Amino acid sequence: HAALDLNIATFLALVTSARFGFVAYRKLTKVSARARKKRRRTETLKIGTPKEVFEGEARVAMTPDSALQLQKLGHECYVETGAGAMAGFSDAAYENAGVSVVKTAAALWKEVDIVAKVRPPSDTEAKRMQKGQTLISFFYPAQNEDQMALLAKKGSTVIAMDMVPRISRAQKMDALSSMANIAGYRAVIEAGNNFGRFFTGQVTAAGKMPPAKVLVVGAGVAGLAAIGTSVSLGAVTYAFDVRPEVAEQVESMGAEFVYLDFEEEQQDGAATGGYAAVSSPEFREAQLAKFRELAPEVDIVITTALIPGRDAPKLWLADMIAAMKPGSVVVDLAAERGGNCDLTVMDEKVVSTNGVTVIGYTDFPSRMAAQASTLYSTNIRHMLTDLTPEKDGVIHHDMEDDVIRGATIAHEKEV
């Protein structure tokens, strides 16, 4: 019996010891977890948005709403005073959202880890970039090779929002599509502003008015936005695209797809990032013949055709303008790349000798600065979410990620 009592006592002592050891371990792990969490909180990224210096640019890369979301990720947000004024966001609105308003651009660039902008940096802004600092903006690397090389040499990282690959997973970061959507919508509004009649047909006591006829050339993101807006305003809408796979989508929106009496196997749009491929000379002639047939009938033409790495193709020629009715309008969304219309002058509105207005503005998104800033800042926020997956204040530049690799044009002193 004495031996049994001893064994029981020993067993109880071991159990008690193990229990206290487990409790002590639990307490220790909780303390270390809290310490890690506290340490993680102290490592915050500083994200700043300067005022755009490009003349006439009204957009801003951070809005009060996007700043709130970024702060939930553990980041600190900064803006230069007046950065959002032209888009309708006051300094007070930023301060109410917990954003630090900095008096000068120079002070902001020195303070932050990440600079978020809309336009490519100016020469002065590029010089302000520091080693280890990250720039996120539209950049157009083919047009800014010298700046790209300069920033890479400095050891800065550059993420070009215009280089985000057009794949399903990257749609939330696709700033080009966001801006093209706005441009397509605004093109129709701008056309209506210069067109002297109703879009929708009306029957009144004063007489019957036919609906406007609108032709949209190119059914990419901008083209589809223009088609949707035109249809919703009541116009009879036609659309043309060299990619036959978009016909069903166009027709589902209430527009009529313009088919050519010509057979040519076109490259699938998915293989060209959603853009049109170069057509054969025979296809082009058939295309132009169809446009000449439509020119006397349509009141408004909106052209959106672009080919990657090339000047915009000339699709609406001078003789087609001459065949249009006086008071008609052409809006050329490809004006920045030379234009689809013969008479287009970049950033200007011209009137032909027969009274056709040709609009070549390139700042349609900036003309809707509040909406454009809201969408663009959301694209930026999603990019930052992918760059900081651990929410620990550390940028994880995963070059095995298709989206991050595709958008990064300078990193670790390499282009």
Model-identified regions with their sequence ranges:
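Glycine-rich phosphate/diphosphate-binding loop of Rossmann-like nucleotide-binding domains
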Residues: 50-86, 200-294
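Adenosine-phosphate binding glycine-rich loop
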Residues: 162-164, 168-202, 335, 341-415
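An N-terminal-biased, well-structured beta-alpha scaffold segment characteristic
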Residues: 44-150, 154
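Glycine/serine-rich phosphate-binding loop and adjoining beta1-alpha1 elements at the start
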Residues: 34, 46, 52, 123-213
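Rossmann-fold NAD(P)-binding glycine/threonine-rich loop
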Residues: 142-168, 312-363
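A structured beta-alpha segment of the ubiquitous adenosine-cofactor-binding alpha/beta core
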Residues: 99-112, 120-121, 268-318, 361, ...
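Glycine/threonine-rich flexible loop motifs
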Residues: 56-61, 124-129, 137, 274, ...
